[in-house]
Amino acid sequence: SDALSSIKFNVFDNQKFTMKELIDAMNDDFKGHEDILNLVKNKTPKYGNDDDYADDIMVSVFNEYKDYITGRPTTRGGVYHVDMLPTTCHVYFGDVMIASPNGRLAHIPLSEGISPEKGADINGPTAVVKSCSKMNHCETGGTLLNQKFTPAAIAGEKGIDNLAALIRSYFAMNGHHMQFNVIDRQTLIE
């Protein structure tokens, strides 16, 4: 939904650049178009920040997708039901795509499930769960929200209490599924 948010915000609502200029920038992987890249990455509403501008677009896209897929017949006599559990297909799809209107460069993975685009969630984990809870999780076969923390972020009793409060809040807002990766940069490098 960040790609659509970028188009709506920058091309239509604020006329920061034209659609042709955006497409040219995407085709060039934003090389030579750093001004556009800066606008779409840093000055555009993004999903995962509890920003209704971006979150309303996510809800609208989800509802259109759900309404189109759910109930359609399968080739074996069943019906389709939408889910938001991509496992690893976000990596493949990102790898075969050009750059996106939100500043994701070519060949970079897409977001995971209902997780915000990597680096887009700048207002913290509470804002992420508030954004995610705006969709109706009960209308899916499942959703996937990945949250990443450094070990220091959840260290000690206070850290564990904060994590527990985040989980409780998400489920109180009718969130469905959340999983965590707790690892530091050095461990990933090793």
Spans of features found by a protein language model:
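Acidic, glycine-enriched catalytic cores built around paired aspartates
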Residues: 1-190
